[in-house]
Amino acid sequence: NCLAPVFIKLMEDGWVTHLATNGAGIIHDWEFAFQGHSSEDVRANVPRGEFGTWHETGFYLNLALVAGAWRGMGYGEAVGAFVEEEGLEIPSEAALEDEIARTVATDPYQAAAAADYLGKIREFKLEPGWMAVPHPFKRFGLQSNAYKLGVPFTSHPMIGHDIIYTHAMNHGAAIGRAAQRDFLAFAKQVENLENGVYLSVGSAVMSPMIFEKSLSMSQNLHIQQGRHIDNHFIVVVDIQESHWDWRQGEPPMDNPDYYLRFNKSFNRMGGQ
């Protein structure tokens, strides 16, 4: 919604220490960096069987995730690096085969990531070497700027929710590896939330769901050290109206506001 320059400035000035989004946020931000716009007529394209089947978005984002998972990156970091570096290095099949043989006994997870990458390289007949992918509008990309500034940018996708799942380059194992790293990175930031602010904008499900798990994990660690996270400030911004005064506690179950997850979950998280 054209606020990327604002968030980039906030990162540059040190006001934002972590950014998180869902899979769609990753896609739109990448498309702006790649081509300067992001839109699609869903109503027209679904009947034609063309919704979300854009080659560039599906191919490049999925490839960045497969490569990033192999490199030990999270979801957002993998895409941010791909944009900022304007491409990626495709390893040779022989190099990956050798890595698999060397690591399968001692690091089977890395061997599996290498095997995933090898499979996609063979499937799409990718030549080894540098694959240049210009991103002429990357100055507007949140992911690339976060990567450049060293600010964690995490993605918390749901399988099948996003258009990249319609492309043959999509690989669930790579997405799972990258997304799990991002969840743990998000939880690590929540661990440092004491005296901080959590701003949730327009996320009715993803934000409250990952936050409550992350806060619980963080409280567990703090309690073991004789501490507790209590002095945090949560701001929920959403266009959907709530007619309940949450300062009174939760509404009864027969009140529709009870089912506004983005209010109910955060109301249970303590702080202010």
Label the model's feature ranges.
Residues N1-I27:
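Active-site cofactor/substrate anionic-group-binding motifs, chiefly glycine-
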Residues C2-V6, D29-S38, Y165-M169, I210-K213:
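Short acidic, glycine/serine/threonine-rich loops at helix termini
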Residues H18-N22, H28, T154-P157, L199-S200, ...:
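General beta-strand structural signal in soluble alpha/beta enzymes
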Residues G25-D29, H161-I164, S207, E241-H243:
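Short gly/pro/ser/thr-enriched loop/turn and capping motifs at secondary-structure boundaries
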Residues H28, E40-L149, S155:
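Ligand-binding beta-strand-loop-alpha-helix segment within the catalytic cores
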Residues P134-H135, P157-M158, H171-E191:
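A general structural motif
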Residues G176, A185-Q189, N195-V197, A204-Q272:
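C-terminal functional extensions of proteins
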